[in-house]
């Protein structure tokens, strides 16, 4: 488990490396602390290939990539929550979580609260399963890009009709 966690911390560094994160000494230092703690220099860490990097490379469209990134960020939040209380790496995890919060959720505490709420929903609870199935139709409608397109067309037609009548 230690090697896997270290490898994940290393991948986090790579994922968040865009936008000059590598140049920021405090963030880079905290990633280095996690690397040392999880012994990332061991060759068996790379066994089986990367966890997230190949998946991220497969998704080119920015909006699609956000979906994958949300799952990856969710994973790291769960990982950090699992390691919570480990005083040796707690400061490093807090700094990295704060940076993720700024980058992924644009610093919005409401979005962070909703994100945390979603990742903490237990999937093995029967009542939760029943609620999720009950809401599935509305969720699917919300996911459908066609419904947004119809709304847009409808409002465009209304606007055009108002202009034509004048």
Curated annotation (Swiss-Prot):
<dbReference type="GO" id="GO:0050769">
    <property type="term" value="P:positive regulation of neurogenesis"/>
</dbReference>
<keyword id="KW-0202">Cytokine</keyword>
<dbReference type="GO" id="GO:0038096">
    <property type="term" value="P:Fc-gamma receptor signaling pathway involved in phagocytosis"/>
</dbReference>
<dbReference type="GO" id="GO:0038196">
    <property type="term" value="P:type III interferon-mediated signaling pathway"/>
</dbReference>
<dbReference type="GO" id="GO:0060552">
    <property type="term" value="P:positive regulation of fructose 1,6-bisphosphate metabolic process"/>
</dbReference>
<dbReference type="GO" id="GO:0002281">
    <property type="term" value="P:macrophage activation involved in immune response"/>
</dbReference>
<dbReference type="GO" id="GO:0005133">
    <property type="term" value="F:type II interferon receptor binding"/>
</dbReference>
<dbReference type="GO" id="GO:0050729">
    <property type="term" value="P:positive regulation of inflammatory response"/>
</dbReference>
<dbReference type="InterPro" id="IPR002069">
    <property type="entry name" value="Interferon_gamma"/>
</dbReference>
<feature type="glycosylation site" description="N-linked (GlcNAc...) asparagine">
    <location>
        <position position="106"/>
    </location>
</feature>
<dbReference type="GO" id="GO:0045892">
    <property type="term" value="P:negative regulation of DNA-templated transcription"/>
</dbReference>
<keyword id="KW-0964">Secreted</keyword>
<dbReference type="GO" id="GO:0030225">
    <property type="term" value="P:macrophage differentiation"/>
</dbReference>
<dbReference type="GO" id="GO:0051044">
    <property type="term" value="P:positive regulation of membrane protein ectodomain proteolysis"/>
</dbReference>
<keyword id="KW-0873">Pyrrolidone carboxylic acid</keyword>
<dbReference type="GO" id="GO:0010634">
    <property type="term" value="P:positive regulation of epithelial cell migration"/>
</dbReference>
<dbReference type="GO" id="GO:2000309">
    <property type="term" value="P:positive regulation of tumor necrosis factor (ligand) superfamily member 11 production"/>
</dbReference>
<dbReference type="InterPro" id="IPR009079">
    <property type="entry name" value="4_helix_cytokine-like_core"/>
</dbReference>
<dbReference type="GO" id="GO:0032700">
    <property type="term" value="P:negative regulation of interleukin-17 production"/>
</dbReference>
<dbReference type="GO" id="GO:0002250">
    <property type="term" value="P:adaptive immune response"/>
</dbReference>
<dbReference type="GO" id="GO:0045672">
    <property type="term" value="P:positive regulation of osteoclast differentiation"/>
</dbReference>
<dbReference type="GO" id="GO:0051607">
    <property type="term" value="P:defense response to virus"/>
</dbReference>
<dbReference type="GO" id="GO:0032834">
    <property type="term" value="P:positive regulation of CD4-positive, CD25-positive, alpha-beta regulatory T cell differentiation involved in immune response"/>
</dbReference>
<dbReference type="GO" id="GO:0042307">
    <property type="term" value="P:positive regulation of protein import into nucleus"/>
</dbReference>
<dbReference type="GO" id="GO:0097696">
    <property type="term" value="P:cell surface receptor signaling pathway via STAT"/>
</dbReference>
<keyword id="KW-0341">Growth regulation</keyword>
<feature type="signal peptide">
    <location>
        <begin position="1"/>
        <end position="23"/>
    </location>
</feature>
<dbReference type="GO" id="GO:0048662">
    <property type="term" value="P:negative regulation of smooth muscle cell proliferation"/>
</dbReference>
<dbReference type="GO" id="GO:0010508">
    <property type="term" value="P:positive regulation of autophagy"/>
</dbReference>
<comment type="subunit">
    <text>Homodimer. Interacts with IFNGR1 (via extracellular domain); this interaction promotes IFNGR1 dimerization.</text>
</comment>
<dbReference type="GO" id="GO:0060557">
    <property type="term" value="P:positive regulation of vitamin D biosynthetic process"/>
</dbReference>
<dbReference type="GO" id="GO:0032722">
    <property type="term" value="P:positive regulation of chemokine production"/>
</dbReference>
<keyword id="KW-0732">Signal</keyword>
<dbReference type="GO" id="GO:0006959">
    <property type="term" value="P:humoral immune response"/>
</dbReference>
<dbReference type="GO" id="GO:0005125">
    <property type="term" value="F:cytokine activity"/>
</dbReference>
<dbReference type="GO" id="GO:0097191">
    <property type="term" value="P:extrinsic apoptotic signaling pathway"/>
</dbReference>
<keyword id="KW-0051">Antiviral defense</keyword>
<comment type="function">
    <text>Type II interferon produced by immune cells such as T-cells and NK cells that plays crucial roles in antimicrobial, antiviral, and antitumor responses by activating effector immune cells and enhancing antigen presentation. Primarily signals through the JAK-STAT pathway after interaction with its receptor IFNGR1 to affect gene regulation. Upon IFNG binding, IFNGR1 intracellular domain opens out to allow association of downstream signaling components JAK2, JAK1 and STAT1, leading to STAT1 activation, nuclear translocation and transcription of IFNG-regulated genes.</text>
</comment>
<dbReference type="GO" id="GO:0050796">
    <property type="term" value="P:regulation of insulin secretion"/>
</dbReference>
<keyword id="KW-0325">Glycoprotein</keyword>
<dbReference type="GO" id="GO:0060333">
    <property type="term" value="P:type II interferon-mediated signaling pathway"/>
</dbReference>
<dbReference type="GO" id="GO:0001774">
    <property type="term" value="P:microglial cell activation"/>
</dbReference>
């Amino acid at each position: 488990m230690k090697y896997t966690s270290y490898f994940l911390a290393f991948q986090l560094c790579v994922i968040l490396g865009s936008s000059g994160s590598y140049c920021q000494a405090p963030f880079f230092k905290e990633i280095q602390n996690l690397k040392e703690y999880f012994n990332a220099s061991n060759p068996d860490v790379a066994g089986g290939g990367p966890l997230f990097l190949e998946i991220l490379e497969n998704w080119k469209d920015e909006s699609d990539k956000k979906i994958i990134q949300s799952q990856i960020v969710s994973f790291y939040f769960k990982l950090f929550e699992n390691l919570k209380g480990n005083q040796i790496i707690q400061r490093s995890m807090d700094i990295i979580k704060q940076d993720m919060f700024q980058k992924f959720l644009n610093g919005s505490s409401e979005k962070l609260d909703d994100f945390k709420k979603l990742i903490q929903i237990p999937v093995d609870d029967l009542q939760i399963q029943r609620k999720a199935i009950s809401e599935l139709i509305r969720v699917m409608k919300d996911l459908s890009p066609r419904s947004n397109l119809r709304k847009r067309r409808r409002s465009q037609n209304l606007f055009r009709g108002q202009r034509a009548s004048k």
